[in-house]
Every structure is written in structure tokens, then in C-alpha cells.
């Protein structure tokens, strides 16, 4: 059986993403500013700096580490993979990029007093509530702990995206598209996988397994 090949778009650290994908039998191909190439079985949009707020009609109000070349490259990849009908998985920044692509917007900087956000390592850990009939609900149940590395979050949800997990009923932590093989999570499942995860935090590997199985389903029909 041919391995599932995943294009991973990234800028900074890539090791944890590659480790997770290999652990579930996939072959990751990691690139910074990849050209449009839909020969891969799926697209993983990884974490990183903030998206230029001009993409959702706002000026700079707290966004940092903007990489306009990366924004443009990943927008082009999103368009191509959607047109090709291939699965897309967004993590943290990738989750936010999917939301913006579908017409949503972001809170550019969460309040410093909000214990939910934490840009440091070790990260904050908090509970999320998931919809029972969602990807996450089927994998983990409706109540579980995740890590938190981000300082931005979904403000308005993109068109047709279905919110499937939230923190305290306030912030969207995950979504999925009802008809397209597209989903995203705000936390970093690759940072808590297998035996390396923090006590009580959900294991990220089942999510990567789901993504790879989805890619195989779409590839093999």
C-alpha cells in the first residue's frame, strides 16, 4: 500500500508535526513557502506567526510576527487543495488561516488578564467542551483538557464552518466544514502525543490518525 503523503506548510519548528505524522504511518513533506502542488494526499497548515489582518479587513491591533509571503503561499495552497477536493487540517495559525479564508476574523490579541492565553512553555492547560457528533467528540468525548500557546482566537466564524469545541462557551477552539474535508483546532496536538503528553492533556495522535485516514479515504475512494 502506498503511504499517505502529507504536505506540511511551516516556518519554525517542524519536528513534532513530522513525528506525529510518521507515528500514524504517513510520510510528511515539510516546506516553507511551498509552491502550489496538489500531488500530495493532504495539506497540514501548521502553527506560527500571525496572519496579516488586512486579510479580514482590519488594521494592526496586536498582530505580531506577520509573514506576508507565508500568508500568500498558504492562501494559494488552500484554494488549490479545496478545488482538488483534498483534506486540509489546520493547527493554531493554520486553524485561524482556514477561518479567515472562509470569511471569518480574529481577535488580534487576547486580554493579558485572560488565563486562557499563554505564549510560554510550558503552556497553559484548559478544558474544552466538544459537540458529541463532531470529529473531536467521536475521538475524545465531550469534555477534555488541551494545551494553549496562542494569543489570537476566532472572533467571527467563517462562512459554513461549524464550531465543534469551545472554551467556557466563549472561544471557538475547533471547527469543521459540514461538506468539505476541512477541520482545524486552536491548540497544538503535535506537542502532546503518545507517552510525551502532559498529565491529563488529551493525546494528539488520534487526531493525526483521523486526518491520515481521511486522506486515504479521499485518495482511494
Q: Where are each of the predicted segments found?
A:
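Conserved ATP-binding module of the ATP-grasp superfamily
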Residues: 140, 145
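Short catalytic/ligand-gating loop segments at beta-alpha or beta-beta junctions
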Residues: 146-151, 175
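Beta-strand-turn-beta hairpins that frame and shape the catalytic cleft
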Residues: 160, 178-182
Amino acid at each position: 500500500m502506498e503511504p499517505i503523503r502529507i504536505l506540511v506548510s511551516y516556518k519554525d519548528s517542524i519536528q513534532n508535526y513530522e513525528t506525529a505524522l510518521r507515528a500514524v504511518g504517513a510520510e510528511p513533506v515539510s516546506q516553507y513557502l511551498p509552491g502550489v502542488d496538489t500531488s500530495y494526499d493532504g495539506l497540514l497548515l501548521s502553527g506560527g506567526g500571525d496572519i496579516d489582518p488586512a486579510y479580514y479587513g482590519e488594521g494592526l491591533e496586536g498582530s505580531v510576527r506577520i509573514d506576508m509571503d507565508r500568508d500568500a503561499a498558504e492562501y494559494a495552497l488552500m484554494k488549490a487543495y479545496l478545488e482538488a477536493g483534498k483534506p486540509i487540517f489546520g493547527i493554531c495559525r493554520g486553524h485561524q488561516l482556514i477561518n479567515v479564508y472562509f470569511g471569518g476574523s480574529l481577535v488580534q490579541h487576547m486580554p493579558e488578564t485572560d488565563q486562557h492565553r499563554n505564549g510560554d512553555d510550558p503552556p497553559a492547560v484548559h478544558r474544552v467542551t466538544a459537540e458529541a457528533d463532531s470529529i473531536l467528540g467521536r475521538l475524545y468525548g465531550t469534555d477534555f483538557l488541551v494545551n494553549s500557546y496562542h494569543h489570537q482566537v476566532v472572533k467571527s466564524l467563517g462562512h459554513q464552518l461549524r464550531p465543534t469545541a469551545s472554551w467556557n462557551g466563549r472561544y471557538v477552539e475547533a471547527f469543521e466544514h459540514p461538506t468539505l474535508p476541512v477541520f482545524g483546532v486552536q491548540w497544538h496536538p503535535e506537542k502532546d502525543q503518545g507517552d510525551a503528553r502532559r498529565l491529563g492533556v488529551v493525546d494528539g495522535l488520534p487526531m493525526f490518525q483521523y486526518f491520515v485516514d481521511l486522506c486515504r479515504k479521499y485518495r482511494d475512494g
